[in-house]
């Protein structure tokens, strides 16, 4: 596996959205920033909030785009081009409808599953979907028509507790991934259930 050089947390900007399900990716970046004791700072040229951490294999950038979700690729593309980071050196954390709250999984590649943030990132990386993902389960509202409102809604207190537990575990697994590689981290996170 390539060394991960960029970890992205997908979100919509502004306080109106910070507690919504669609911002679960940002919750993970905040957890990693806490672990490494760094603060994200707004960087206009990368259309996002950025921090740098030093992990076992070298420098890793953290990024939360401050564009809206469907323009996330603008931020990822700008930072990846500037630092010459390849798709397989990128880990994207995002909310996942197909996993229940309390579960998170690591995987490489795959489609966007209708997730507009992933769709835009794939396009911005020259149609490459070869990056890694941390899929943070938020559950599914049951019907396609309800999805748009659901992802922009706040989880129930019980679901939030489970999502927080999965985000905490994902944070520990990202640390493991940076130290020991993808396999150990994937096996550990994929077995977790809050």
UniProtKB/Swiss-Prot annotation:
Residues that bind tRNA: 17, 68, 70, 116
SUPFAM superfamilies: Peptidyl-tRNA hydrolase-like (SSF53178)
Catalyzed reactions: an N-acyl-L-alpha-aminoacyl-tRNA + H2O = an N-acyl-L-amino acid + a tRNA + H(+)
PROSITE patterns (UniProt xref): PEPT_TRNA_HYDROL_1, PEPT_TRNA_HYDROL_2
GO cellular component, one term: cytoplasm
Annotated localization: Cytoplasm
Residues with site note (Discriminates between blocked and unblocked aminoacyl-tRNA): 12
Main EC class the enzyme belongs to: hydrolase
Protein keywords: Cytoplasm, Hydrolase, RNA-binding, tRNA-binding
Gene Ontology MF annotations: peptidyl-tRNA hydrolase activity; tRNA binding
Entry's Gene Ontology BP terms: protein quality control for misfolded or incompletely synthesized proteins; rescue of stalled ribosome
EC number: 3.1.1.29
Site feature: Stabilizes the basic form of H active site to accept a proton: 95
Residues forming the catalytic site: 22 (proton acceptor)
Assigned protein family: Belongs to the PTH family.
Its job: Hydrolyzes ribosome-free peptidyl-tRNAs (with 1 or more amino acids incorporated), which drop off the ribosome during protein synthesis, or as a result of ribosome stalling. Catalyzes the release of premature peptidyl moieties from peptidyl-tRNA molecules trapped in stalled 50S ribosomal subunits, and thus maintains levels of free tRNAs and 50S ribosomes.
Subunit structure: Monomer.
Record's protein name: Peptidyl-tRNA hydrolase
């Amino acid at each position: 596996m390539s060394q991960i050089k960029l970890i992205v947390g997908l979100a919509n900007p502004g306080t109106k959205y910070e507690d919504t399900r669609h911002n679960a990716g940002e919750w993970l970046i905040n957890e990693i920033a806490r672990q490494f004791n760094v603060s994200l700072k707004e960087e206009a040229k990368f259309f996002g909030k950025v921090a740098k951490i030093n992990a076992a294999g070298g420098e890793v950038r953290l990024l939360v785009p401050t564009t809206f979700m469907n323009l996330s690729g603008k931020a990822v593309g700008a930072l990846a081009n500037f630092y010459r980071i390849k798709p397989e050196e990128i880990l994207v954390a995002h909310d996942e409808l197909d996993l229940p709250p309390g579960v998170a999984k690591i995987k490489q590649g795959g489609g966007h599953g209708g997730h507009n943030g992933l769709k835009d990132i794939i396009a911005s990386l020259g149609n490459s979907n070869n990056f890694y993902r941390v899929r943070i389960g938020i559950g599914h509202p049951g019907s396609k028509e309800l999805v748009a409102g659901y992802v922009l809604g706040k989880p129930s207190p019980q679901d939030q507790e489970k999502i927080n537990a999965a985000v905490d575990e994902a944070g520990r697994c990202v640390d493991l991934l940076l130290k020991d590689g993808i396999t150990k981290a994937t096996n550990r996170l994929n077995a977790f259930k809050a």
